[in-house]
């Protein structure tokens, strides 16, 4: 049957965690107050504000309180969809103004070209919004990589720690589980993908990170698909 598609995690797998934690997250925290003030009547932003109030169980929260909630969620690394949507919108401005480029590991830049040449389908699955993923790969320090991808998945597909999310991906891309390889640095994500029947591979870029009973690689250079 063979592998026909590769689904990659982003942070820690294709992208340095430090770029997310030290560049993108602080940028979004700093920009949130002005962004919400200036865009609160935009339909998408307004929906995110309402969703934030619903999740926080604070229906009467004013804009300042909503900002506090969202900034707290950033510090807690909450995977809440309204936060991820707003971060994507804020980062879009940062990329457009040239304030940063998306960090992508060089070995993935070469691998994604190799996989594409092999006619393998390539997808990303991240807790960051689909828009944020597209921004990362289109403004990467390796150039625009988006044409190499067949699609992207985020929290709307499901929680990355839940088997159902991976079942949903399989249903969307219409491949059998054994035709799909999921690559991530996070053990719990790999377990969930494995429970859905996917093939799995753990990316171990840091010798101190937790590892599980999975095939392991330290670089995409080691991932050769026959």
Curated annotation (Swiss-Prot):
Pfam families: Hydrolase. SUPFAM superfamilies: HAD-like (SSF56784). Its EC number is 3.1.3.77. One of its GO terms (biological process) is L-methionine salvage from methylthioadenosine. It catalyses: 5-methylsulfanyl-2,3-dioxopentyl phosphate + H2O = 1,2-dihydroxy-5-(methylsulfanyl)pent-1-en-3-one + phosphate. It comes from the Bacteria. Its cofactor is Mg(2+). The keyword Transferase does not apply. Pathway: Amino-acid biosynthesis; L-methionine biosynthesis via salvage pathway; L-methionine from S-methyl-5-thio-alpha-D-ribose 1-phosphate: step 3/6; Amino-acid biosynthesis; L-methionine biosynthesis via salvage pathway; L-methionine from S-methyl-5-thio-alpha-D-ribose 1-phosphate: step 4/6. Keywords: Amino-acid biosynthesis, Hydrolase, Magnesium, Metal-binding, Methionine biosynthesis. It is an enzyme of class 3 (hydrolase). GO terms for molecular function: 2,3-diketo-5-methylthiopentyl-1-phosphate enolase activity; 2-hydroxy-3-keto-5-methylthiopentenyl-1-phosphate phosphatase activity; acireductone synthase activity; magnesium ion binding. Binds 1 Mg(2+) ion per subunit. HAMAP family: Salvage_MtnC. Monomer. Bifunctional enzyme that catalyzes the enolization of 2,3-diketo-5-methylthiopentyl-1-phosphate (DK-MTP-1-P) into the intermediate 2-hydroxy-3-keto-5-methylthiopentenyl-1-phosphate (HK-MTPenyl-1-P), which is then dephosphorylated to form the acireductone 1,2-dihydroxy-3-keto-5-methylthiopentene (DHK-MTPene). PANTHER family: ENOLASE-PHOSPHATASE E1 (PTHR20371:SF1). Belongs to the HAD-like hydrolase superfamily. MasA/MtnC family. This is Enolase-phosphatase E1.
